[in-house]
């Protein structure tokens, strides 16, 4: 069942893709709180992960982009990383295939909407295993790259 939180009407002249890929603008837009549908989608994306995370766990999100996870993950020991160098990141210019982080550093690692961007998945999984502590958790959330998902991405202005 799809729940529409708020129906949005767009003007014919609005360029809905002008900030596509601009992480800083996406983060500002989200923090304004105007798009209730986006909030709903992101809440569903991240909230279920809290059931796998303990209060004092140390976590990392790889490929965090805007870092929306910090809004929904209740654990305050979550660090965010990305291949980019945006100022909101805890770890900048991190290659998920070779993070250069210490062995056994994290109780959990989140990879949300990342796997379809990873060119060498086996190398990625080996690296995640290396940086996770014994019995650590790799929490993966990824959507289908179907045409429907691509259309929804354009409509929501967010991947």
Question: For the regions a protein language model found, what residue spans apply to each?
Answer:
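A short acidic, Gly/Pro-enriched loop at the edge of an enzyme's catalytic core
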Residues: 97-109
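Conserved class I S-adenosyl-L-methionine
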Residues: 139-159
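Conserved N-terminal segment of class I S-adenosyl-L-methionine
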Residues: 1-98
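Short N-terminal helix/helix-N-cap motif within the alpha/beta-hydrolase-1
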Residues: 119-123, 148
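A short beta-strand submotif of the Rossmann-like class I SAM-dependent methyltransferase core
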Residues: 111-114, 140
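A short glycine-rich, Lys/Arg-flanked "PGG" loop and its adjoining helix->strand segment in the class I
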Residues: 122-137
């Amino acid at each position: 069942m799809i729940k529409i939180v708020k129906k949005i009407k767009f003007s014919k002249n609005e360029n809905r893709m002008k900030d596509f890929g601009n992480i800083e603008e996406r983060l500002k837009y989200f923090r304004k709180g105007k798009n209730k549908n986006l909030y709903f989608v992101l809440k569903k994306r991240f909230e279920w992960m809290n059931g796998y995370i303990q209060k004092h766990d140390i976590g990392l999100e790889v490929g965090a982009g805007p870092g929306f996870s910090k809004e929904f993950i209740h654990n305050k020991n979550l660090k965010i990383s990305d291949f980019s160098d945006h100022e909101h990141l805890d770890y900048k210019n991190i290659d998920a295939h070779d993070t250069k982080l210490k062995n056994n550093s994290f109780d959990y690692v989140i990879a949300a909407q990342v796997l379809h961007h990873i060119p060498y998945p086996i190398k990625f999984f080996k690296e995640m295993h290396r940086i996770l502590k014994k019995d650590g958790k790799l929490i993966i959330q990824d959507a289908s790259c179907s045409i429907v998902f691509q259309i929804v991405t354009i409509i929501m202005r967010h991947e």
